Amino acid sequence: MNSNIKKWAVSLSAIALLCGISVLPIVNFDLQASAWEDYELVTSGTDGNFSFSIQDGKATLTDYTGSDAIVTIPEAVGTTTKTTPSKTVSVPVTALEQTFYNNSNITSVTIPDGVTTIGYNTFTYCDNLKTVSHGKQLQSIGESAFSSCSALESFSFQEGLLTIANDAFSNCTSLKSVTLPNSLTTLGESAFQNDSALESVQFGNGIAEVSAHAFESCSSLTSITFSEGIQRIRENAFADCSALKKLTLPNSLTQIDSKAFCAIHSETSLRSISFGSGLQEIGPYAFAFHTKLAGILTLPEQLTTIGDYAFSGCSSVTQLQFPNGLQSIQKGAFQNCSELRAISLPNTVTTLGESAFENCNNVKNLSLSGSLTELPNLAFYGCGISDLCIPDSVTQIGVETFSNCSSLSAVQLSRNLKTISHSAFYNCEELKSISFPTGLETIGEAAFAQTALGSISLPDTLTELGQAAFYNIPQLKFAKIPGSLKTIPRSAFYNCYGLNAVELQEGIEIIEESAFANASLRSLILPDSIIEIGDAAFQGVDYLSTIQLGSNLQLIGSKAFLLQSDTLCSLYVPESVISIGEKAIGYWAEFEWNTPTVGSHFILYGESGSEAQDYAKSNSISFLTKSEPGLTKYYDAATGITVFAPDSGLQMQISVSDSQKLEPDPGYTFQGWYQIQFTKNGNNYTPAFLQVQIPMEQNVRRCTVFINRLNGFYTEIYYPQNGSIDFTTTKDAFQLDVCKQLLGDVNDDGTVTLADLIMLQKYMLYNGTLLAPENADLNQDTACNGFDLLYLKRTLFPSIG
C-alpha cells in the first residue's frame, strides 16, 4: 500500500511540473499517520514565534516568543522530514501546553476550531489576559491552564467540553461568572479556587461530583445553581465563600464531604440552607462557623450521618429538625450553637460523638434517643437545660457530659446506668436532687462537685467512687454510703459545709484524706469494717460532739479529727488501733491559720498500754482506762422523744410551745418549740451533749430543725430513717417543722398547681423529671401512669369531670 501511495505522489508531482505549478508536499492528517512514515517527520521545532512538538501527526504549541498583545493561534505549523529537509509538511495544531506561561504582554487570544486541548500551564500567570476566544471542538482544559490570569473577566464554556483539570482557573480574580456545559463530566480540584470576583456558578447535568477545593475562597460568590445529577460535593469545594447567603442543594446529592461549605478563614453571610431529599451524609466541618445561619435547620429524611463539627459555631441556629432515620451525630457536630433552644434526638440515633452539643448554652429542653447506650464526653457541656431524663438504654455517662449546665435542677437517671464518669455533672450549680439507680457501679472524680444536691443515697451496687465526687456542695445535708464501696476516696465530700448526717454502712474499709473535711456532722458512727482513716479525713468538721469508732480500726491519720469547734468531749479508741497521727484526736482550731489546741473538756478513753494511751500522754490529753463510755437513755412519753445523754441519774422533762415560733419554709408545717430540761439531785443540769431521737409519721418526707445559738439560729434538714430522725446537739432547745407528703406536688414546692400538672405530663412523655416522685401516685395504686395524670387534671380543673 505504501508503495502505491508513493507512486501516486510522484505521478501527481510530475503532472504539476509539466503544467508549471509550484507544489509543496502538504500533508493531510485526516489520513493515517502511517502513510507518511517514510518521510520521518521532524517532531519538534519552531514556526514563526511558536515552538511546537508533534505526536501522532498532531501539533502541540509549547512556547511563544513574540511580544504581541493580541495573538491568534495558527491552525497548523510547518515541519519537514528527515529524508526531505527541503520539503515542508503542514501539521494541524490541536493542543497548547505551557505556550504563554508567565507572559505579561498578551491581552487577547484567539484559538482556532481545531484545538481540542488547552493543556498544562498554557496561560498561567498571564496577568493581563482579558479575553479568550476558542472553537467548538475544545474538549479539555488542563491543569493550571489559566491559573492566575488575574485580568480574565469571562470564559465561554461551550458544549463539547469534557474536562476541566486541577487549578485550571484558580486565582482568576476578575472572572465573574461560570456556566458549565452539560457535556462536562470532570471538574478538577481547585479548578476555580480563589476567584475572588466570581459571583455565580451554574452546573451542567453531566457533573456527578464537585471536586475538592473547586470553588474555595470565591469570596464574591452569591449564586450557585446545582443540576440534578450531582451526587457528591468533595472537601472544601465551597469553603470560605463568604458572600453566599442562600444555598439550595439538589435531590440527587447524597454526600457532602469535609469542610465543603465551611467558613474557615472569613466572615460568613450564609443564612439558609435547603437540603435535597437524597442527602445521606454530611461530613466533618461541612457547614462549620456560619454564624449568620439562622432560624430552623431542617435536615433531610434520608440523612443518616452528621460528621465531626459539621455545624459547629453556627451560633444563630435556633431549632434543629432531625429526620427519623438519623443514626450518627459525631464529635462536635453542633458545638457552640449558642442560640439553639431545644434538642430532640430521634430514637434511630445510636451514636453520639464527644462534644456533640457542647456550649449550646440556650438549650432549655433535651430529649434523648432511646437507642443510645452511652452519653459521651462533653456531649452537653455548658448547655442551658433545666431538667433531664436519661433513657434506660444508657449505661454510661462520659467525662464532663453535663458539666457546667448551670440551669440543670433535676435529673432522672437511666435505670440501667453503670458508670458516671469524671466531672459528668460538675458545676451544675442548680442541681438539687438526683436518685441513683440500683446497678450503678462507678461514680468518677468530681462527678457531682459544686452542685446543689440536698441529699444522696448511693446504691449498694456502687463499688468505685472517684476523688472529690461530691466536693464543695454546701447544700448537702445527708449522705448514705453503702458497704459495697470499700474506699471513700480523697476529698469525696470535702467542703460540704452543710453535711450534718452521714450513714456509713458495714463493709466500708478505708476513709481517705480529707474525705469529709469541713462538714458539719453532729455525730459520727463508723462501722466495724473500717480499718483506716486518712489524714484530715474529718478536719474542720463543725459541731461534732459524738464519735463512735469501729472495733477493727487500725490507722488514724494526722489531723483526722482536728475539729473546727470545741464540741467533742470524749472519744473511745479501740485497742485495735496501732497508729494515731499528729493532732489526730482531741484538737480543734476555729480557722486553718489558728494553732490547734486540745479541747477544754476532752477526755480520751482506751485500754491500758494501748496506742491511745501513748497518744494521750504525748499530747497531754486526759486519759481514762476504761471501756467506751455509755449513754443513758431518757424517754418522754408525752412527745415520744428519746434522748441519750452521757450522764446517768438524771431526770428529764420536755415542754412544747409556740412562743418562739419561726415562720416555716414553704411546704413545711410548724410542729413546736421543744425545750429539754434535765435535773440532777433537784438541781438544773446541762449534759455535754444530747442525742435526740424523734418519731415521725409515715407520710413525713423531711424535717427542719432550728437550733438557737448565741449568734442566731442555724437550720438542719433531716430525712426520716426507720420512722424517726436522729440528731446530736449541745443545745437544749429547738424548733421542729415537718414536710409531709402532698399528693400531686411533684415539683416539691409545697403546693399543687398547674406547674405540677405540666411536670407530670412531661414525665409521662418520657421527657422530664419529677422532683418528688413519691407524690405522683395520686390514686394510690402503687404506679405512676395516665390515671394519675387524669386525677391531677380533675383535681385542678373539676369541670373536666
PLM feature segments, named:
Residues 99, 119-122, 142-145, 165-168, ...:
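Consensus positions within tandem repeat domains that build extended binding/scaffold surfaces
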Residues 628-640, 682, 709-742:
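Proteolytic cleavage junctions
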